[in-house]
From Swiss-Prot:
The species this protein was found in: Mus musculus
Protein family according to the UniProt entry: Belongs to the BolA/IbaG family.
Keyword Cytoplasm: yes
Protein task: Acts as a cytosolic iron-sulfur (Fe-S) cluster assembly factor that facilitates [2Fe-2S] cluster insertion into a subset of cytosolic proteins. Acts together with the monothiol glutaredoxin GLRX3.
Localization annotation: Cytoplasm; Nucleus
Primary location: cytoplasm
GO biological process: [2Fe-2S] cluster assembly; intracellular iron ion homeostasis; protein maturation
Protein name from the UniProt record: BolA-like protein 2
A GO molecular-function descriptor: 2 iron, 2 sulfur cluster binding
Disulfide bond entries: none
One GO location term (cellular component): cytoplasm
Keywords per UniProt: Acetylation, Cytoplasm, Nucleus
Length: 86
């Protein structure tokens, strides 16, 4: 399996039915071992942060063992809209 920001973005978008996904490879030489993600999904509605992160972790269960560092931000569509206005 070859990890890339594009691969992770598409998997998160499909599996979490996300309306917006940003994935940044934060590895020094872009060698795909560290990522920062932002996922906006209605599936996060009514769920606390820990449950949201679990959904993301479950989605990427096969990929996470190959990732050295993983930072995630999970928002509902309403939170995303509000945050962009600020």
């Amino acid at each position: 399996m070859e990890l890339s920001a594009d691969y992770l973005r598409e998997k998160l978008r499909q599996d979490l039915e996300a309306e917006h996904v940003e994935v940044e490879d934060t590895t020094l030489n872009r060698c795909a071992t560290s990522f920062r993600v932002l996922v906006v999904s209605a599936k996060f509605e009514g769920k606390p942060l820990l449950q949201r992160h679990r959904l993301v972790n479950e989605c990427l269960a096969e990929e996470l063992p190959h990732i050295h560092a993983f930072e995630q931000k999970t928002l509902t569509p309403e939170q995303w809209t509000r945050q962009r206005r600020e």
